């Protein structure tokens, strides 16, 4: 077993009444209902141990500003192993699909880290590649999107980035 530290960033969190109306526990099983509501009731901007194996850090804020060094109020940007990029389509949320954001996400991923998104458009794939990722198109989930993208920060890319930084000092 591995311990999981999950950070979720939500600009417009759902009200508890809306969560109850959605009734997701009937999909995940009533045995998980208590955990489901514990996750949603966890306080914002603080780490919460949901179980000995799962720590949750919910951030209420604008994702595009949290990783912007000029606008960011947090003192340090954490590093991640996996980023599940679940934004609306580029036509609906263009600010979430800018090259500078993918460049930053690349930087906050650990070596070998993965970014995955349901948006498999060519323009998104090319932006991820420009940021330095190795990108693969994979079959989407059953009953959902036809394809997804998996972008990996490869060892070679990470080594080149590290070598470039050390040569600048």
Model regions and ranges:
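A short helix->loop->beta-strand "cap" motif at the edges of active sites that frequently abuts
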Residues: 2-4, 109-113
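Conserved SAM-binding motif I beta-strand of class I
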Residues: 5-10
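S-adenosyl-L-methionine
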Residues: 18-73
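Short SAM/SAH-binding signature in class I
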Residues: 56, 78-87
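Conserved beta-strand signature within the Rossmann-like core of class I S-adenosyl-L-methionine
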Residues: 82-84, 111-119
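Short glycine-rich, flexible loops that bind phosphorylated cofactors or substrates
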Residues: 91-92
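A short glycine-rich, Lys/Arg-flanked "PGG" loop and its adjoining helix->strand segment in the class I
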Residues: 95-111
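Class I S-adenosyl-L-methionine
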Residues: 121-169
């Amino acid at each position: 077993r591995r311990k999981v530290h999950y950070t979720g960033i939500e600009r417009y969190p759902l009200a508890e009444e809306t969560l109850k109306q959605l009734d997701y526990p009937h999909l995940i099983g009533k045995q998980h209902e208590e955990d489901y509501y514990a996750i949603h009731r966890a306080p914002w901007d603080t780490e919460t141990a949901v179980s000995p194996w799962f720590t949750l850090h919910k951030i209420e804020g604008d994702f595009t500003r949290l990783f912007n060094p000029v606008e960011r109020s947090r003192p340090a940007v954490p590093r991640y192993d996996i980023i599940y990029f679940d934004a609306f389509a580029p036509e609906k949320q263009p600010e979430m699909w800018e090259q500078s954001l993918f460049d930053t996400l690349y930087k906050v991923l650990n070596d070998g880290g993965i970014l995955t998104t349901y948006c498999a458009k060519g323009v998104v794939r090319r932006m991820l590649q420009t940021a330095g990722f190795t990108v693969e198109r994979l079959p989407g989930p059953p009953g959902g999107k036809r394809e997804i993208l998996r972008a990996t920060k490869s060892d070679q890319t990470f080594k080149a980035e590290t070598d470039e930084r050390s040569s600048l000092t």
